[in-house]
Amino acid sequence: MSIQDAPLLDSANMGADGILGVDSLSSQRVVFDFEGQTMSIVPSQSAEAEKEPGSIVVKAKRKKGRLLMTDATANGRNVTIVVDTGAQVCIGNEALRQKLTARNLTDPLEKVQLLSVTGERLSGDYMFIKELVIGGVTLKNLAVVFTDAHAFHQLDLDRKPALLLGMNAMRAFKKVSIDFANRKFRVVLPEASELDIRMASAT
């Protein structure tokens, strides 16, 4: 595969020497082993690997190279989840915030700024979602920044409640496997607590 044109980004904004786009992962599986502190990219797997003790698989659909999960709720309100390993913190859109704040389901904590890989700064409200349920997975006290991120417009999700699932959520698990070809999001729950995963606040 040859690339004729590629964007040139400032490494100070990326925090790395480069970024691997989702377009290169269409037949791959990305595995984050948070206990072993490793990340690996391997071919999509068969169902046998899903038998690891403590694992839960959530089916997803693909849209513009990303995995979306619709079997999800935030504080009891329906929400579309977008897997986003490039986001350090979970990001919610304005439609989701309106759903939650209309019934006092969450309270704003403080104003924050996010820095994108292109150097763009986004202002947002930093809050906690008390409970996020994705398939058979429940996350408690999830730190979220609500802002008008470009990804929501790109995926036609700017007018319906949606959440970019960032790395602060994924680090709650022992392992996370994102299988783009088979459209599956698999997590391995930590042994200490498989029912009540408490989220550490993002910084």
PLM features: residue spans?
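Pepsin/retropepsin-fold aspartyl endopeptidases
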Residues: 1-203
